[in-house]
Amino acid sequence: MTTFQTAPVTLPTPLGGSLVRRIWRPGQDFDPAELAGRPRLELSSRSLADLEMIATGAYSPLTGFVGEADYLSIIEHLRLADGTPWSLPITLPVTAEQAAGLSGRVVLTHGGEPVGTLDIEEKYAAQKSLEAREVYRTEEEAHPGVAALYAQGDVYLAGPVTLFEVPRGEFPRAHRTPAEVREVIEARGWRSTVAFQTRNPIHRAHEYLQKVALELVDGLLLHPLVGQTKGDDVPAETRMEAYEVLLRGYYPQERTLLSVYPAAMRYAGPREAIVHALSRRNYGATHFIVGRDHAGVGSYYGTYDAQEIFNTYTAEELGIRILKFEHTFYCQSCGQLVSPRTCPHDSSHHLVLSGTKVREKLRAGENLPPEFTRPEVAEVLRKAYTR
């Protein structure tokens, strides 16, 4: 009888060659208890999220907040100074007054509690107008990313960081580091994994994209962003409940992993799509879905700009395959979910609900049509909006 040996799972190499780990462990060159006399710096929610993403290796190869050479190279060339693909400047802003009083090893705090350290190697001036134009493609403060940029300090601190403990937050069972996600993928024997980024509840069009992709690969990493978002986005706790009921009823459990992505949204559209893809490579994904207006807001970016920007790099540089999908919707004449590639009917036949329209219906206590979202998801959302 012929026997077949199962080949071991080979996960993609993290960006930069190895997974960064900047989480404090006993035996390191310092003990957190010995830092009582060091200067302190309170982090915003976004900077705390950046600290975690750096320290756990999600933002490999970054080992800290970027210095000026990397900052300018990212802005102007979508690469680190050494040529590695990277599209968002991960910086630590402070005021000029704060910067003047900080040097050496600084204790980073959040809510007054120590969460990590920064070894300051560099202080430099933020070039906000340039950053806004190149990263967000606008200087309008109506853009939430630009508004945040202009509101923060004018000096950036750079240097390696250490995180004392991974903040598991509201969803400890689903809060996994890149190393932990990689362990799950290996344990399940997935040789190919597609990651799906979302900051919204999953509607039928998203489900369609995920399941089309799941026909091509072994596993789906459903990776909702739970960091800071803008005020009118659906809260993370509501979204997580919606994801869980959807997965229980409509997805193969052994081929699906729900794990949170703790980054904050910057709404940088195409540039943010690149970091979303590269970081999912660090989590162990081999494929990444990019749909219409990925990480966009308002009308600042073209519908498929976030797909086209990946042409900036070679496939070898990216190290993760980008699955580009067109806009999908329910066609009443076709009687199913379709895209412009598969549907011959005009828009009068299509059921499309904007996020604004969905929120209006939910606040009014109205049901969402089953062609748009699963009834179980609609019920979770309806309850959340009518409490």
Curated annotation (Swiss-Prot):
Keywords: ATP-binding, Nucleotide-binding, Nucleotidyltransferase, Transferase. Its EC number is 2.7.7.4. CDD domains: ATPS (cd00517). InterPro entries: ATP-Sase_PUA-like_dom (IPR025980), PUA-like_sf (IPR015947), Rossmann-like_a/b/a_fold (IPR014729), SO4_adenylyltransferase_pro (IPR020792), Sulfurylase_cat_dom (IPR024951), Sulphate_adenylyltransferase (IPR002650). Pathway: Sulfur metabolism; hydrogen sulfide biosynthesis; sulfite from sulfate: step 1/3. SUPFAM superfamilies: Nucleotidylyl transferase (SSF52374), PUA domain-like (SSF88697). Coiled coil: none annotated. One of its GO terms (biological process) is hydrogen sulfide biosynthetic process. GO terms for molecular function: ATP binding; sulfate adenylyltransferase (ATP) activity. The keyword Calcium does not apply. It comes from the Bacteria. It catalyses: sulfate + ATP + H(+) = adenosine 5'-phosphosulfate + diphosphate. HAMAP family: Sulf_adenylyltr. Belongs to the sulfate adenylyltransferase family. This is Sulfate adenylyltransferase. The gene is sat.
